[in-house]
Amino acid sequence: MSTDARANHRIKSIEIDEESLAAASRDQEQERQVAIFDLLEGNYFEPAEAGDGPYDVRLSLIENRLAFDIASAGHARRHLLSLSPFRGVIKDYFLICDSYYSAIRNSSPQQIEALDMGRRGLHNEGSNLLRERLEGKVKTDLDTARRLFTLICALHWRG
């Protein structure tokens, strides 16, 4: 894909519905802000049948489903994804993140590294699942899916 075509298929703005957003710890809020910054700095996001972007994206929860509202010039579309396939990986991700944040303050570098490897593995699992669930609706690269997965988790954090 050419650089110009790739530049047109990107998210230019991302919004998380405040009503859907769960309370977050300071660490979680920082992780969310970093994910938003990194996502907007570089991403690949190509909705099916949407034409050229860039795109404005809004994430929210609607009746226990994840809503992706995607808009660009002359295009607006909502994709709803069931949260059921994500529940296990999100639950495990939260558990290991809690352990990781605690370890940063109290554990050896080896323990922190082991938890970080587990955290990254679960993050990759969630990101790959997101790409699978979006198949036929939206194409993304792995880095974009990873950042979106972080933001999806933000909708579930229960401070």
UniProtKB/Swiss-Prot annotation:
InterPro entries: UCP032146. It comes from the Bacteria. Belongs to the UPF0262 family. This is UPF0262 protein CCNA_02430.
